[in-house]
Amino acid sequence: MRLSPVLLRLSRGPALLALALPLAVALAFSDETLDKVPKSEGYCSRILRVQGTRREGYTEFSLRVEGDPDFYKPGTSYRVTLSAAPPSYFRGFTLIALKENREGDKEEDHAGTFQIIDEEETQFMSNCPVAVTESTPRRRTRIQVFWIAPPAGTGCVILKASIVQKRIIYFQDEGSLTKKLCEQDSTFDGVTDKPILDCCACGTAKYRLTFYGNWSEKTHPKDYPRRANHWSAIIGGSHSKNYVLWEYGGYASEGVKQVAELGSPVKMEEEIRQQSDEVLTVIKAKAQWPAWQPLNVRAAPSAEFSVDRTRHLMSFLTMMGPSPDWNVGLSAEDLCTKECGWVQKVVQDLIPWDAGTDSGVTYESPNKPTIPQEKIRPLTSLDHPQSPFYDPEGGSITQVARVVIERIARKGEQCNIVPDNVDDIVADLAPEEKDEDDTPETCIYSNWSPWSACSSSTCDKGKRMRQRMLKAQLDLSVPCPDTQDFQPCMGPGCSDEDGSTCTMSEWITWSPCSISCGTGTRSRERYVKQFPEDGSVCTLPTEETEKCTVNEECSPSSCLTTEWGEWDECSATCGMGMKKRHRMVKMSPADGSMCKAETSQAEKCMMPECHTIPCLLSLWSEWSDCSVTCGKGMRTRQRMLKSLAELGDCNEELEQVEKCMLPECPIDCELTEWSQWSECNKSCGKGHMIRTRMIQMEPQFGGTPCPETVQRKKCRIRKCLRNPSIQNLRWREARESRRSEQLREESDGDQFPGCRMRPWTAWSECTKLCGGGIQERYMTVKKRFKSSQFTSCKDKKEIRACNVHPC
């Protein structure tokens, strides 16, 4: 019996031959007579031949290149997916890329190279390294690899896949298992015009657009704008072919210009709404500040929209900020299929394009209007040496974003009779039974349990269920969704495949032989990755043991040891760890030498995969008000720790502080207290007294200006005599002075009861030569009487104005 080529890789050594044979039996390849297969006569030609019955007319398997391009760009990486629509599956596969009209029997027939994404799922064929096959033959519904397009001049390439489903049933190459891509030859790099066909689909379809920004300092390090990087609000619509929002080779409208230069969607939305007959839904989603952060992946901005037969195209755009006029988006993406149905899913990687309205070449170039306006075009790596995307070798620009458009509902009578997949079969299930994850960030759940068995026991549509536990509800005002989830399924009667199949991990490397001389044993282990879907017990072995021989003819220097003891427990509870075991020397070497046999061993051990939950943080709050109302201060913002990491501490920053600067604080004028009133400037008749105060601080930065510093008030001593002689006047003044002094001395006891005062000192010098100064004099206590209870007995001070004339 010859093994299927899918299984031949298992027979690469005598140790694996024993595994390959029972596995072939398990897959039932030996249940029917196999046709003889001729030996390979050329390079990799054997991988295109499989024994058994070939099936045709299948639609459940598909080979898809991400974005569904018809052309490839030389040297560009493309994600290739081979999938089976539920409830179908496949066990084995081969995938190759051939130049058009080549058979694959020569090395030069193959085009491009594949890159492995998941080594547990896929590997290169050992005897045909240009082809990809499965790592382990088991039930699967999807695999993915990268394909690197060949150099320029290769021409058209055909990707071909072969599917082994079960027993000896296989599908190969034709129809949906073949994808033809031709070398890009377009005016615009990376842009190919697709003719827009009339749509024949019925009813309407509802889609969700999700935008994943990938523009970051890590992916695009050259001149990355750290402070103000962002994506503007998404704006677009679902529309007919009679309306164009934007397109390569066209001119930007005023709305597109304002999005491209200012990040403002207002004018663009106004333009879209003016085309009400041609537009079904306006698409809007929030802006992203900053352009990249983990939240952009966990809770990427999204928007829902609808399409119908006449308005089956969708377009949108968003600005890269800061930039001169650079955007990303889709133009006239057709969601109607040739089979009169609605596209299930679209995934597109996006590169930036220039709106043709500003001639800047760097992220933060000053405004430089393009006059006359140029056509919209994709940016290339050869545009300008100062461009952040410049590459002297002309390589492709790394994608800056990805958009995913998924169909989430269909309404009305549908005219595509043949369903796309099981989801289409049960498209009319109630909304609560849809498999949509709308879990708020404030709800922390455990991992989902495995899916239950399908509710239908025959080949008919049914439902299956899974459950999870609500661990924490961080915000009681936000309700948490149900802890049960339902998914459409087809009963087991649709396939004669055993539903009790369980998924196993790869075998861990064989342990060392149990003895150092002679015949012993060695073992290896694996673990169950997924238990059977029908809930039965997995009966596949998790440990294998085989004999091993080391130095059949043991020399006199050999020593005799006990069997190895049991392995210690694995040092890890999940993931990769270490375990040890020991043995003892039973008999030393006959020649008296030291026993060189190992007495302890350590090896890696694999526990079930770790499922860790990183610490969950809230969004940053808005910056607080500045700590001051003017001048220099500080402001802060915070975020909350919603959930600790399942393993380890959360070391993320919870508070940020930065300086803030407000206009300088106004400084008001500052003055001293008023001085005491001066003596009247006349000895008789009407006069005036003054008092003054000093400026201590001049006003600054709009502070209150200084008020008056000198005040006057009238005073009147007594009436002056009319026309007295000067001599008589002086005599009278002298007499009055003597009389006043006598009265003062006589009244000292009454004016200052309880103490005797010294006379007033002389007036001090004026503090200013002009403009109003002050003078001071003092009277001090000479003697206090012991029996005095008066509080007026204290030192005195008088102040008067002087030199009040202007300077």
Curated annotation (Swiss-Prot):
Subcellular localization, as worded in the UniProt entry: Secreted, Extracellular space, Extracellular matrix
Residues of the TSP type-1 domain: 442-495, 501-555, 558-611, 614-666, 668-721, 754-806
Residue intervals of the Reelin domain: 29-194
Main location: secreted
PROSITE patterns: REELIN, SPONDIN, TSP1
SMART domains given in the database record: TSP1
Domain named Spondin: residues: 195-388
Disulfide bond among keywords: yes
GO cellular component terms, semicolon-separated: extracellular matrix; extracellular region
The keyword Cytoplasm is annotated on this UniProt entry: no
GO annotation, biological process: cell adhesion; negative regulation of amyloid-beta formation; positive regulation of amyloid precursor protein catabolic process; positive regulation of protein processing; protein processing
Disulfide-bond pairs as recorded: C44-C128, C156-C182, C199-C336, C200-C340, C202-C415, C443-C480, C454-C489, C459-C494, C502-C538, C513-C517, C548-C554, C559-C595, C570-C574, C605-C610, C615-C650, C626-C630, C660-C665
Molecular function terms from GO: LBD domain binding; metal ion binding
Protein residues bound to Ca(2+): D325, D354, D358
Residues bearing attached sugar chains per UniProt: N214, N681
Known role: Cell adhesion protein that promotes the attachment of spinal cord and sensory neuron cells and the outgrowth of neurites in vitro. May contribute to the growth and guidance of axons in both the spinal cord and the PNS. Major factor for vascular smooth muscle cell.
Subunit comment: Binds to the central extracellular domain of APP and inhibits beta-secretase cleavage of APP.
Name of the protein this chain belongs to: Spondin-1
Organism: Bos taurus
